[in-house]
């Protein structure tokens, strides 16, 4: 299992500009042991080969991905409510991994797996085309300063890759409290053939009742921040990319 990110796998050149800054600190012995034990049970190692979800989850249920799950609130809530769906969470921060693993263990959820690695590389190298029913990216770092925009995780390249990973009719859900970021995402999506914006007004949708309002989101709402919810449907024919 990986405790620290490794950027060169099998001599492959990994991307240089990343959407995160490592804040992982030294762990206590107990936390290191917990992480080791439960990543073995609930984690998937990074590799440059596609994951067989039917084998990993021992069923053929739909797979839902959350990129950057934070404390794991949303991921766990969805997994508990949807036992006939499988959930994959990708995260790079150890505190987030620890929090989510505790939830998975507490509720004994067989339908959740986590990957401790860079989401862009996981999606590119580990997830086969036409294998995801839904993708969530909730409150990604907006990197508000112009000189940092290149660090944003949501790029045209990522959205094009996600489109190939989604099944026909699959959904991409994004939420942010940064209007500039939201508009940027809309502009990017407009230039990608294969997505339909499900907003009646061509921009944002109302938050679905089944999407848990996380602690992070609640704090923003208390401060008066507006939340921008985006939802897109894949109409891309993946048959040529299987």
From Swiss-Prot:
Cellular component, GO, one term: tRNA methyltransferase complex
Residues where substrate binds: 145, 177, 214-217
PROSITE patterns, alphabetized: SAM_MT_TRMB
Active site: 141
GO molecular function, one term: tRNA (guanine(46)-N7)-methyltransferase activity
HAMAP family (UniProt xref): tRNA_methyltr_TrmB
Protein name: tRNA (guanine-N(7)-)-methyltransferase
Organism: Buchnera aphidicola subsp. Baizongia pistaciae (strain Bp)
Gene: trmB
């Amino acid at each position: 299992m990986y405790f620290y990110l490794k950027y060169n796998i099998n001599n492959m050149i990994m991307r240089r500009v990343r959407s995160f800054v490592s804040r992982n600190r030294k762990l206590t012995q107990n936390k290191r042991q917990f992480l080791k034990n439960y990543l073995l049970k609930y984690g998937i190692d990074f590799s440059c080969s596609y994951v067989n979800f039917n084998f990993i989850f021992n069923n053929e249920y739909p797979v839902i991905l959350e990129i950057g799950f934070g404390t794991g609130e949303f991921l766990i809530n969805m997994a508990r409510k949807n036992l006939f769906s499988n959930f994959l969470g990708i995260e790079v921060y150890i505190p987030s991994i620890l929090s989510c693993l505790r939830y998975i263990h507490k509720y004994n959820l067989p339908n959740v797996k986590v990957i401790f690695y860079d989401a862009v590389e996981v999606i590119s190298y580990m997830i086969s085309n036409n294998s995801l029913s839904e993708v969530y990216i909730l409150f990604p770092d907006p990197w508000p300063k112009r000189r940092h925009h290149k660090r944003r995780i949501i790029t045209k390249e990522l959205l094009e890759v996600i489109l190939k990973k989604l099944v026909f009719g699959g959904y991409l859900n994004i939420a942010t409290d940064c209007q500039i970021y939201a508009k940027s995402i809309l502009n990017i999506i407009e230039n990608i053939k294969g997505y339909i914006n499900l907003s009646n007004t061509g921009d944002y949708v109302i938050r679905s009742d089944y999407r848990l309002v996380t602690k992070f989101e609640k704090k923003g709402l208390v401060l008066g921040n507006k939340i921008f919810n985006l939802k897109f449907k894949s109409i891309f024919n993946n048959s040529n990319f299987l």
